[in-house]
Swiss-Prot record:
It comes from Renibacterium salmoninarum (strain ATCC 33209 / DSM 20767 / JCM 11484 / NBRC 15589 / NCIMB 2235). 5-phospho-alpha-D-ribose 1-diphosphate binds at R78, R103, D130, P131, M132, L133, A134, T135, G136, A137, T138, D201. The lineage of its organism: Bacteria, Bacillati, Actinomycetota, Actinomycetes, Micrococcales. Binds 1 Mg(2+) ion per subunit. The magnesium is bound as Mg-PRPP. This is Uracil phosphoribosyltransferase. The gene is upp. Its EC number is 2.4.2.9. Catalyzes the conversion of uracil and 5-phospho-alpha-D-ribose 1-diphosphate (PRPP) to UMP and diphosphate.
Length: 211
């Protein structure tokens, strides 16, 4: 398993505005999309490509094209949906699947409540979108689910991560073809398993508090 923290001044700037509790939901959504596009640029460095023949207005030449089947993008519902536009802006030909997962606030374990994915992911590169890597429970189960369907490799794009969550993923998926791409690794988790300093509940800040 590989962990990559994207070091870029624009990433740091946008993340700072996201952290600010006074940033309203419309601005939060827009900045999330922009930040994800920056993270996706680094996350797709290992995307599979092949040589293709094309013809320019001047002559025939050889270029680069994405290998088929194209990558699969999987946002974790609901907060991961706020990252989807930023990802598909960079990979518009990618297919999109969905995993609905929620955290049990008592056990802190992840519960899968919905999925819309191909049954067979053999040979597919998968990009999982989940803004907060806190305890690691959600991504741990998502990665296990995708590998069970024979995904080739999995890259998880997160806005923030905590050392506890990264270690939990490493314990279960060490040696696996998994990459975690983040804007920042924060100090740790508080007693409610929220990332500190963090940015609060990403889903609530994207869409407002429901229920």
């Amino acid at each position: 398993m590989r962990v990559l923290v994207v070091d870029h001044p624009l990433v740091a700037h946008k993340l700072t505005v996201l952290r600010d509790k006074n940033t309203p939901s419309p601005v939060f959504r827009q900045l999330t999309e922009e930040l994800v596009t920056l993270l996706a640029y680094e996350a797709t460095r290992e995307v599979r490509v092949e040589e293709v023949s094309i013809e320019t207005p001047v002559t025939k030449t050889v270029g680069t094209g994405l290998v088929k089947p194209t990558p699969l993008v999987v946002p974790i519902l609901r907060a991961g949906l706020g990252m989807l536009e930023g990802m598909t802006r960079l990979l518009p030909t990618a297919e999109v699947g969905f995993l609905g997962m929620a955290r049990n606030e008592e056990t802190l374990e992840a519960i899968t409540y919905a999925e819309r994915l191909p049954e067979d992911l053999t040979g597919r590169q998968v990009y999982v979108l989940d803004p907060m890597l806190a305890t690691g429970a959600t991504l741990r189960e998502a990665i296990k689910f995708l590998f069970a369907r024979r995904a080739l490799d999995i890259t998880c794009i997160c806005l923030l991560g905590a050392p506890e969550g990264i270690e939990a993923l490493r314990e279960q998926h060490e040696g696996a073809n998994v990459t975690i791409v983040l804007a920042s690794i924060d100090e740790g988790l508080n007693e409610k398993a929220y990332i500190v300093p963090g940015l609060g509940d990403a889903g609530d800040r994207l869409y407002g508090v429901v229920g």
